[in-house]
Amino acid sequence: MKKHWPENERIKRRYFTFLKEAKRHGEPTVDAAAKALNRFEIYTRYRDFKTFHFQQAIAFKRYLAEQKDQQSGEKLSKAALHATLTQLKRFFQWVAWQPGYKSRLQYSDAEYFNLSDKDAWVATAQREQKAPTLVRKQGA
């Protein structure tokens, strides 16, 4: 049975309001943040965010890299890893400045949610789009 830490629920609600109202993000962004936080909470067994330690971020990255996509059954793509970890990094950077968390969390600990440079490059690479052409291929 999953347990929710009430203080975590309150700070998440404040963060989602911050994303919507202050940062002017839409529902898809807020939903992505909620999904990333849910994955992290499942991994930590719903521990209080005030007990966050950078070792949790390192271990979570390894755990997430081994997870399978529900639809394809394959490991999560680098883009999915990047999106999840970026949402978590932004949340922990924000929460480190909130009252009640400033003395417990280090702003710099959120940096441990970064992928390696190579993986981040793969995750954010722009794929060349094939555009239609008016030139006919020979022999077609």
Where are these regions (language model features)?
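A detector for short, charged/polar N-terminal pre-domain segments
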Residues: 1-10
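Basic, Lys/Arg- and aromatic-enriched nucleic-acid-binding interface segment
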Residues: 133-140
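Flexible glycine-/small-residue-enriched beta->alpha junction loops
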Residues: 129
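Alpha-helix N-cap/N′ positions at the starts of helices
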Residues: 10-14, 139
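N-terminal core-binding DNA-recognition domain of tyrosine recombinases/integrases
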Residues: 13-28, 34-126
